[in-house]
Every structure is written in structure tokens, then in C-alpha cells.
Amino acid sequence: MKLRHLLLTGAALTSFAATTVHGETVVNGAKLTVTKNLDLVNSNALIPNTDFTFKIEPDTTVNEDGNKFKGVALNTPMTKVTYTNSDKGGSNTKTAEFDFSEVTFEKPGVYYYKVTEEKIDKVPGVSYDTTSYTVQVHVLWNEEQQKPVATYIVGYKEGSKVPIQFKNSLDSTTLTVKKKVSGTGGDRSKDFNFGLTLKANQYYKASEKVMIEKTTKGGQAPVQTEASIDQLYHFTLKDGESIKVTNLPVGVDYVVTEDDYKSEKYTTNVEVSPQDGAVKNIAGNSTEQETSTDKDMTITFTNKKDFEVPTGVAMTVAPYIALGIVAVGGALYFVKKKNA
């Protein structure tokens, strides 16, 4: 019995040898491993709560000939890997499997499939891999089970020796809040109070932290702090100072508000300036609800205060100004006449 099994297996391997693509991609057994690699453009980027889904389906473009067949549909044609906000550091590579042991093959041969990444949940800031991989499932007669079974698998991309690996990149953005004080009465040394609220969503949960750098006047190194999503972050800025959220996730809603300084005779204007976008001006002390994009954002709060000259002082000074003008005019007339 064993001799017969070996002879059959050897014959099958010889028959299918012409269809083997690269030895580096061969997997023994009935399970195909798919690797997902999430590259962080910003090493401090928050990883979203999301799934990446892969689909395998019969390759209907195959011309069936001899031992070459279109694949047989799997009972479970979809598999996925899951990422959460807790995935940090070196945990950005994950794997999933397709199991061909559940498939009933009618006869030995090489069965062809295609594996792709599905864009079921398209996360803002994530670029998706559009590669389509070819999978060859080599089905041999199994003497013990008395039926054809998946014995080894070859997965590859045309012209490549690498195994099936889908690569995605995750980008983050920056949000800069600047302070400007103008006018003859504006206090350039005053600390103005602000609040920043980042709102949680399905991808980024409350209490997850982003990094903030505060730049002050004088050329000192930026001071680094953290802000939590869904918690009001308080900060102060003087004229010429700023804060920058350095790893703001794309697709997060936020609001920046300054305290109301009308009682101190300040008028406030907010300038919202997206990178490569249209500038928006808001009369008031708060932004509208903004949504972060893959373009960096700069928001400038300008507080203006001018001193008014008291009416009494103006009335008292006015006669002297008039007399001065008359005196200067008379002097000029005298000089001009003398020269004539």
C-alpha cells in the first residue's frame, strides 16, 4: 500500500512539475498564509481600529488543459486581520489563512485562484494594495483518505518570487495652532487660554493619545506634551507662540476654542489655512468643527486691541495743533517772501 502511495505521489509531482513557479513560494499542506504589512509614514502614528479583508476566488481566466483547472470555490472565501489602537511599535505585521482542506476536489490537478484585498472598510489615511496574486493549489491523490486533497500551494505575483504579502501605508497629519496679537493696545506678553477637543470615532477610541509640541519665543527647543482624544486639552499661547499636533490621525473631527476676551477690549479673528487649500476666516474665538485630512492644517488666532484717544484729551490738544499749523504756515510764507 505504501509503495503504491509513493508511486502515485511521485508520478503526480513529476506531472505537475512544469506548473511550479518558484520554490521559494511553495507551502506544504492545505493552508495558504496571507501576510499584511501596515507601514507607518509617521512612526508615532496611531493605528486605527479596523479590519483588512482578503478574498480568494477561482481564476476564471485559466484555460483548462490536462491537469490545469479553474479553482473550486471555498466555503469561506474571505479572511481578515484585525488592528486596534493598541497595536504599536513592532506589531504592524499580521497574517491570515485560507484553508483548502474544506474544499472537495473531484480529481488531482493544479487548481488556480486569485487573491485580492477587499476595500470593505476604507479607513481615512490608509492606502490600499491593489495587487492580485495567483495561487496554484496542487491536489494529489491521498491514499489514506481515498480522495484528492490539497497537498501543497504556490502563491505568487507575476514576475515575482515573493510570497503573498499585501502592503498598506498609514499616513497621519499635523495641526498647528498659532497666536498673533496686534494693535496699539495688544499685550504681547499675555498668556491667552485655549482648548482643543479631538473627537473619538469608530477608528480611534477615547483616551488614545496624540503628541503635541509647543514652540515659544526665543529659540528654545519645543516642549512636548500629550493630549487625549475626547478630553479637553488646555493650553496657553503668547504672541508668536504655537502648538503642533504632530501625529493627528486623518479623519478625526476637532474644535479649537480660545477664551472670550471681549471684556478686555480684544476682537478675535480665526484664520483656518489647510495646506494647498482655500483660507477660511471666522470672526470669533472658535473654529467650526473641522475634520483632519491628509493635508497639514494651520489655524491662526489673532487678537487685536487698539487704544482710543480720550475725547477730552483730543479737545484739549486740538487748539494747540491748530496754532502749530498756523505758525508753520506763517514761517513758510515769510521765508518764501524774503527769498523773492
Swiss-Prot record:
Protein name per its UniProtKB record: Pilin
Keyword set, alphabetical order: Cell wall, Fimbrium, Isopeptide bond, Peptidoglycan-anchor, Secreted, Signal
Classification lineage: Bacteria, Bacillati, Bacillota, Bacilli, Lactobacillales
Keyword Calcium among record annotations: no
Described function: Major component of the pilus. A stack of the pilin subunits, joined by intermolecular isopeptide bonds, forms the pilus. The pilus is required for bacterial adhesion to host cells, for bacterial aggregation, and for biofilm formation.
Topological relation to the membrane, as annotated: Peptidoglycan-anchor
Family: Belongs to the Streptococcus pilin family.
Processing and modification events after translation: Proteolytically processed and assembled in pili through a transpeptidation reaction catalyzed by the sortase C1. The last pilin subunit is cross-linked to the peptidoglycan.
Threonyl lysine isopeptide (Thr-Lys) (interchain with K-161) cross-link, chain position(s): 311
Chief subcellular location: secreted
Crosslink site: Isoaspartyl lysine isopeptide (Lys-Asn): 36-168, 179-303
Site residues, Autocatalyzes isopeptide 36-168 formation: 117
Numbered residues of crosslink Threonyl lysine isopeptide (Lys-Thr) (interchain with T-311): 161
Coiled-coil intervals: none
Self-association state and partner proteins as the record states: Forms columns of about 3-nanometers in diameter of head-to-tail-assembled molecules.
NCBIfam families recorded: srtB_sig_QVPTGV, strep_pil_rpt
